[in-house]
């Protein structure tokens, strides 16, 4: 039967293993039995589980006194580590003392092992190791971070990032990553799926650039423009420029083709969307917009519509809409562009056209044009032309209405002199028995949103389409 407690030395009743002891204490606990085997004596020994607070203090003080060597206490508290530089100032004599002292302690430990045949206890070995570590200056590396050698992948990444930064800094400061630049040199698209044939003449490109720079003044379109995401803005600018180039030169292909093949009822129904048709129908009088589609078909087939198309081709062929001529004024060109879409009997288009042709022939002459009407019932309008040498009154029998204008001053350059002339072809308010046509030209700028306020019946849609092109 195994041994049973309690321990004859400390009085513990439970232990993992009961051990043999000296004859006066035959049964010992695990701790006391281990002490007896290693040291051979139980004098002044109390295991940790049996110590009281007072006994622990006494044993600790006693152990401190036994470790005193040459008046030097080894149980000092571990001092705070001083800066790294102070570790190099330790005197050589102190270093030799600690080295000899440690060697002596190791010799004593070896003798104890040989005499008792076992190792020293855990508590004493820990106390001794702490004592040596606390007094002997240990050499540690500094905490200064050393640069780590970069790998080849990191070097390549850094070089690429540097190149990217240089490229971004070299770019213009006003541009963004989402802006794209397009140069529109040869626009071919006229709109609604139709493609315009180009002029084969060699000088066509120069004429196009001059005409487009002046006719499209309201939209301020240029050959190089910024477009975000290549959206609808670029397409609209191309269409505007193409239309202005078609009208802005006397050699335009509009003069040689049959416009009735382009402006007809079938093309209107086939090529225009429902939204575009509704937008153009707002420009028509109520007579043409109520009974659809018969009213539209009769409008396209009317003789008045065909007459307007032929007159428009004649004006384009004569170069009326070219703004690079020296005798023409920009406001007059814009006015003619609008009048070409109205009834020639109402809009005084012929008078304005003849007036421009006269300026081309006459040089060094100051001309003041005034067109007025005596009353709405009169069928004739009076045009007065004053010259330095003579005065001439000319009556036009085919014009009716009232035409008024504020005085505007324009400089005409001739071969020898530059003189001022007053022009009065900027505001028209014609009235006739054919319909209340009220057309007021107040702004000098023509935009694509200009609407034809009143047009004759059975001849409105193509006129509105031509107005949109201008």
UniProtKB/Swiss-Prot annotation:
> Does the keyword field hold Repeat?
no
What molecular function does GO assign, one term? Answer: sequence-specific DNA binding
Q: Which UniProt keywords apply?
A: DNA-binding, Metal-binding, Nucleus, Transcription, Transcription regulation, Zinc, Zinc-finger
Q: Which domain of life is it from?
A: Eukaryota
Alphabetical list of InterPro entries matching this protein: ASX_DEUBAD_dom, DEUBAD_dom, GATA26/27, Znf_GATA, Znf_NHR/GATA
One Gene Ontology CC term in the entry: nucleus
| PROSITE patterns linked to this entry | DEUBAD, GATA_ZN_FINGER_1, GATA_ZN_FINGER_2
Q: What is its main location?
A: nucleus
Do you know which Pfam families this protein is assigned to? Answer: ASXH, GATA
Q: Where in the cell is it found?
A: Nucleus
Supply the Gene3D superfamilies for this chain: Erythroid Transcription Factor GATA-1, subunit A
Chain positions of all zinc fingers (GATA-type):
1-55
Domain DEUBAD intervals: 250-359
Could you tell me which SUPFAM superfamilies the record lists for this protein? Glucocorticoid receptor-like (DNA-binding domain)
Hey, which family's this protein in? Belongs to the type IV zinc-finger family. Class D subfamily.
Question: Would you tell me the protein name for this molecule?
Answer: GATA transcription factor 27
């Amino acid at each position: 039967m195994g041994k049973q407690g309690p321990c004859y030395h400390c009085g513990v009743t439970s232990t993992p293993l009961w051990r043999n002891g000296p004859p006066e204490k035959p049964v010992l606990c695990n701790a006391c039995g281990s002490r007896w085997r290693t040291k051979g004596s139980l004098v002044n020994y109390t295991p940790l589980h049996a110590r009281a607070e007072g006994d622990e203090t006494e044993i600790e003080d006693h152990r401190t006194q036994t470790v005193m060597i040459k008046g030097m206490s080894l149980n000092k508290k571990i001092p705070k580590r001083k800066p790294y530089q102070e570790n190099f100032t330790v005197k050589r004599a102190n270093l030799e003392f600690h080295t000899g002292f440690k060697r002596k302690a190791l010799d004593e430990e070896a003798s104890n092992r040989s005499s008792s045949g076992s190792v020293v206890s855990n508590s004493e070995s820990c106390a001794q190791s702490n004592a040596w570590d606390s007094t002997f200056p240990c050499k540690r590396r500094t905490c200064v971070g050393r640069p780590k050698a970069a790998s080849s992948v990191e070097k390549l990444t850094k070089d690429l990032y540097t190149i990217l930064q240089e490229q971004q800094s070299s770019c213009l400061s006003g541009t963004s990553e989402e802006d794209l630049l397009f140069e529109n040199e040869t626009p071919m698209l006229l709109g609604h799926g139709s493609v315009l044939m180009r002029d084969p003449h060699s000088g066509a490109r120069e004429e196009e650039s001059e005409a487009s720079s002046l006719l499209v003044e309201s939209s301020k379109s240029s050959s190089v423009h910024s477009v975000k995401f290549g959206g609808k803005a670029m397409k609209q600018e191309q269409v505007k420029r193409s239309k202005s180039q078609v009208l802005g030169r006397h050699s335009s292909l509009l003069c040689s083709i049959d416009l009735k093949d382009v402006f007809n009822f079938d093309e209107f129904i086939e090529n225009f969307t429902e939204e575009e048709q509704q937008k153009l129908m707002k420009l028509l009088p109520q007579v043409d917009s109520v009974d659809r589609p018969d009213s539209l078909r009769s409008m396209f087939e009317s003789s008045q519509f065909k007459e307007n198309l032929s007159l428009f081709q004649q004006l384009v062929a004569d170069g009326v809409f070219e703004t690079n001529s020296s005798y023409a004024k920009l406001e007059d060109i814009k006015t003619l562009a609008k009048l070409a879409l109205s009834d020639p009997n109402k809009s005084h288009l012929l008078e304005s056209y003849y007036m421009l042709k006269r300026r081309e022939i006459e040089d060094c002459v100051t001309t003041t044009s005034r067109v007025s009407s005596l009353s709405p019932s009169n069928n004739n309008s009076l045009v007065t032309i004053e010259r330095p040498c003579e005065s001439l009154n000319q009556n036009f029998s085919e014009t009716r209405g009232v035409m008024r204008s504020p005085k505007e001053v324009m400089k005409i350059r001739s071969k020898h002199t530059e003189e001022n002339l007053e022009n009065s072809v900027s505001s028209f308010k014609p009235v006739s028995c054919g319909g209340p046509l009220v057309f007021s030209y107040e702004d000098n700028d023509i935009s694509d949103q200009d609407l034809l306020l009143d047009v004759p019946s059975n001849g409105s849609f193509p006129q509105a389409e031509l107005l949109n092109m201008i």
